[in-house]
A protein has these predicted regions:
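Beta-rich interaction/scaffold domains
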Residues: 2-13, 260-341
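Extended, low-complexity, turn-rich repeat/linker tracts enriched in Gly/Pro/Ser/Thr and Asp/Glu
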Residues: 151-164, 176-179
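Aromatic (Trp/Tyr/Phe) and Gly/Pro-enriched flexible surface segments
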Residues: 13-142, 146, 164-173, 179-210, ...
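Short edge beta-strand/loop segments characteristic of extracellular beta-sandwich folds
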Residues: 146-150, 294-296
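Solvent-exposed loop and beta-edge segments used for protein-protein assembly and interaction
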Residues: 138-141, 162-164, 219-221, 287-289, ...
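Generic hydrophobic alpha-helical segments
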Residues: 34, 153-154, 302
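Secondary-structure boundary elements
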Residues: 6, 150-157, 216-220
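Beta-strand elements of well-folded, non-transmembrane domains
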Residues: 151-153, 172-176, 215, 233, ...
Length: 341
């Protein structure tokens, strides 16, 4: 591409597999996971559930099947499977169906106790039956997490009739121990978080959701991501039935981390510029510097560069915005008539 061509060019740098993405986020790969001699489930590769959770002597009954491989896929999918997660009952209590990129810890018989959590820790050397670790490495900084879901609210009683939402949460950390929900307010290893605890059923139809990340003011580097999905936003607040058709059930398909690279505002010497047929025009009689151009983007982590060139008609400024995963770039061209460098 000619850098001095007066065009706004969008460049797709290609889809390099798994860079900046969660492995198997399309939920096409599954393996059999077992607990003991009789308990087993089809578990999505790189994702984990209660069947391979950490338990205590009092909570060992939590190791039961919650996950299923489903052939019900989102509209327009090129794949053939999705992940289905269902609630179960344990000792007469509702056990929310949960899946995570980390590991589940069932540390208490009290549902709302933060000893019941998902966690990641890059120093953890344990692996699942397939050989995958209980964490997901991520060194990029996405702007949002996007996924397709179909949610069914199971049987409700008077005591839990208002508990009608599923939930997803994500945390990007520096890779040291982190759990969700947090057991204290002293975690300083968080880079960004995203959460939606109001996932509705919409009559059990497929819906596409996007949840933005909120970035912290921190010098910690992104090294890992913990994503957790649950059939109920209230711990132990879901269906009290283990019958098919009465359990809470959520299906997840085609998840991806979103990396933006768009300009939301371009200013020259404080004046907002508008685009006309792919070019931003303005006039100025005098010398132009890169610092005269202000750019705002829809990403806190995109890379922005500015260049200026003399032409017969004035100055052409080129603004390049590259997404944090380096897969997408946008170019913006500004013609400043009458100016010099």
């Amino acid at each position: 591409v000619d850098p001095e061509s007066p065009m706004n060019v969008r460049v797709e740098l290609g889809d390099v597999e798994n860079i900046g993405q969660i492995p198997n986020s399309n939920f096409e790969a599954f393996h059999e996971e077992k607990s003991g001699l009789t308990k087993k489930e089809d578990q999505a590769d790189h994702w984990h559930s209660f069947i391979n959770s950490e338990t205590t002597a009092l909570t060992s009954s939590a190791k039961m099947k919650h996950n299923w491989k489903s052939n019900d896929v989102r509209p327009g999918s090129t794949g053939t499977s999705s992940l289905e997660v269902k609630s179960r009952t344990v000792l007469g209590q509702s056990a929310n169906g949960t899946v995570t990129t980390g590991r589940i810890k069932a540390g208490s018989i009290t549902a709302e106790d933060p000893a019941n959590c998902s966690y990641l820790d890059l120093s953890n050397t344990e692996k699942d039956k397939k050989g995958d670790p209980y964490y997901t490495i991520l060194t990029c900084k996405p702007d949002a997490i996007e996924f397709w879901t179909k949610f069914f609210v199971g049987k409700r009683e008077e005591s839990n009739k208002d508990n009608i939402y599923a939930t997803i949460s994500a945390a990007i950390t520096d890779g040291t121990y982190y759990q969700d929900p947090q057991d204290n307010d002293n975690y300083t290893n968080v880079v960004a978080t995203a959460k939606n605890d109001k996932i509705e059923s919409l009559d059990n139809t497929w819906q596409k959701l996007t949840v933005p990340f909120n970035y912290k003011e921190t010098d910690k580097a992104a090294k890992a991501i913990l994503v957790t999905i649950s059939t109920c936003s209230v711990p132990g607040g879901g269906s009290l039935s283990d019958k098919d058709g009465e359990q809470d059930a959520i299906k997840i398909d085609d998840m991806r981390l979103v990396y933006n690279a768009n300009a939301t505002s371009i200013k020259f010497k404080g004046e907002e510029l508008t685009e006309e047929e792919g070019v931003y025009y303005t006039t100025f009689n005098g010398e132009v510097k890169n610092s005269d151009l202000e750019v705002e983007t829809d990403s806190k982590s995109a890379y922005v560069t500015k260049s200026i060139f003399n032409t017969e008609d004035g100055v052409i400024a080129i603004i390049n915005i590259v997404s944090n995963d380096l897969k997408t770039a946008n170019r913006y061209v500004i013609l400043i008539e009458g100016a010099t460098t």
